[in-house]
Amino acid sequence: MIRDILKMGDERLLRIAPPVPEHMLGSAELQQLIDDMFETMRHVGGVGLAAPQVGIDLQLVIFGFERSERYPDAEAVPQTILLNPVITPTSSEVEDGWEGCLSVPGLRGVVPRFKHICYQGIDPQGSPINRFADGFHARVVQHECDHLIGRLYPSRIQDFAKFGYTEVLFPGLEVSED
């Protein structure tokens, strides 16, 4: 089922999400939420989605793609379901990059993010996940996990000369919503 995506200004996006409780692991309810999130993400051409964006207060993010029309120059990111994540930078190197968000439609901005990270958490059955990521993969993970602490990417922008409407900044980029 395609779910509605909350938009910036909805106070539910500002909440800190609690961890997915142990009793939900492996449940049909959790699997339905994950299936709905993937269907929703694909429907709008996104590269990631966090449960709070669909109004569910849980530490759950999904991300991954082979090729993205929204980010045509980005390298592929493996499809991942990540619960109760922890992100640790593995170097102090920070990289600026353009970001958009399904909850901030039609806009893009340059956001600084750690270039190299380790992310940990669990999968829907409770098995541990421990991965290293860099570049766009690291950016996507950090962006999605920000939603779990009630943070949207515009709050991380340092130069508002590099923030605006996608259609103005990137004419001809075909995206249904940004």
Curated annotation (Swiss-Prot):
SUPFAM superfamilies: Peptide deformylase. The active site is at E144. InterPro entries: Peptide_deformylase (IPR023635), Peptide_deformylase_sf (IPR036821). It is an enzyme of class 3 (hydrolase). Its EC number is 3.5.1.88. GO terms for biological process: co-translational protein modification; translation. GO terms for molecular function: metal ion binding; peptide deformylase activity. It catalyses: N-terminal N-formyl-L-methionyl-[peptide] + H2O = N-terminal L-methionyl-[peptide] + formate. It holds the Pfam family Pep_deformylase. Keywords: Hydrolase, Iron, Metal-binding, Protein biosynthesis. Transmembrane segments: none annotated. Fe cation binds at C101, H143, H147. Its cofactor is Fe(2+). Binds 1 Fe(2+) ion. Removes the formyl group from the N-terminal Met of newly synthesized proteins. Requires at least a dipeptide for an efficient rate of reaction. N-terminal L-methionine is a prerequisite for activity but the enzyme has broad specificity at other positions. PANTHER family: PEPTIDE DEFORMYLASE, PEPTIDE DEFORMYLASE 1. Belongs to the polypeptide deformylase family. This is Peptide deformylase 2. It comes from Pseudomonas putida (strain ATCC 47054 / DSM 6125 / CFBP 8728 / NCIMB 11950 / KT2440). The gene is def2.
